[in-house]
Regions:
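Conserved beta-strand segments of alpha/beta enzyme cores
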Residues: 36-38, 107, 130, 147
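Short glycine-/acidic-enriched loop or helix-start segments at secondary-structure transitions
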Residues: 15-16, 49, 68-69, 101-103, ...
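A short acidic, often aromatic-flanked loop/helix-cap motif at beta-alpha or helix-coil junctions
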Residues: 44-48, 116-119, 140, 156-157
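Cysteine-nucleophile active-site neighborhood
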Residues: 59-124, 130
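Short, glycine/charged-enriched secondary-structure capping and boundary segments
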Residues: 18-21, 52-54, 71-74, 105-108, ...
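N-terminal beta1-alpha1 cap of cysteine-dependent amidohydrolase-like domains
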Residues: 1-71, 75-78, 82-86, 194-226
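Conserved beta-strand termini and adjacent loop/short-helix elements that scaffold enzyme active sites
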Residues: 40-42, 111, 134, 151
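Amide-donor transfer/coupling interface in amidating biosynthetic enzymes
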Residues: 2-7, 25-29, 85, 123-226
């Protein structure tokens, strides 16, 4: 099964030698599930010719906001709507979670209570899953037809399921602790409050359920579809 990665942001260059870029992180996360991958850098205006150029699509995270004025965001939203119409499955992570929601009629805003960074606990339909986070934007209005499948006190709409069309999560299952640590030392400086980063640093060694989330993503992609 070919998964097309729609890359909407670039990892900091200083961290790429040790961690790779975002597509590398997702390939590492989903290793062992039988997928092959191809990446399109939509952040640089590179788009697939058709929603059928892959068997499923994965939209990455980004430092950009989905509500910002970038020339590649409207065509990405149109691509998402076309994939929905053609029943091509999509997974969205962080920015990907938000852009799918926005494209399908939801609302995304900068959250008044600020940032979620590092190991964060989520309630996935009664199951506690801890994943790394890095965001201050949130889906504040769920699109029609989407079901909330994960939540916590900070992020009410932490994961959404759109029947068999899309699975989206606000957290970053692809982020390893050392990458979060690197982000705090690079992009976090002067942007994320020191108290938030200090609390995140205290949880860097905590076990994550990234493999659990990888299994959920893989199972979603592999669901039988008419």
């Amino acid at each position: 099964m070919l998964i097309g990665i729609l890359q909407t942001g670039l990892a900091p260059e200083a961290l790429q030698d040790a961690n790779g870029d975002y597509p590398d992180m997702f390939q590492r996360l989903l290793d062992g599930h039988g997928f092959t991958f191809r990446t399109w850098k939509v952040v640089e205006g590179e788009f697939p010719a058709s929603v059928h150029d892959a068997d499923g699509w994965l939209i990455t995270g980004s430092r950009h906001g989905v509500y910002e004025d970038h020339p590649w965001i409207p065509p990405l939203e149109e691509f998402i709507r076309q994939a929905f119409a053609e029943h091509v499955p999509m997974v969205g992570v962080c920015f990907g979670h938000q852009i799918i929601a926005q494209a399908m009629g939801g609302k995304v805003e900068r959250y008044a209570d600020g940032w979620a960074v590092g190991a964060t606990d989520y309630d996935f339909d009664g199951e506690k899953i801890t994943l790394n986070a890095w965001h201050r934007d949130q889906v504040t209005q769920v699109p029609p037809g989407a079901k909330v499948i994960a939540t916590n006190d900070f992020c009410a709409n932490a994961a959404l399921l759109y029947d068999d069309r899309a699975l989206t999560v606000q957290a970053h299952p692809e982020f390893r602790p050392e990458f979060v640590d690197g982000l705090m030392k690079t992009r976090g400086k002067g942007l994320v409050p020191e108290a938030v980063m200090a609390a995140a640093s205290q949880r860097l060694a905590e076990p994550l359920q990234d493999r659990t989330m990888a299994g959920r993503i893989a199972a979603f992609f592999k669901e039988p579809r008419a």
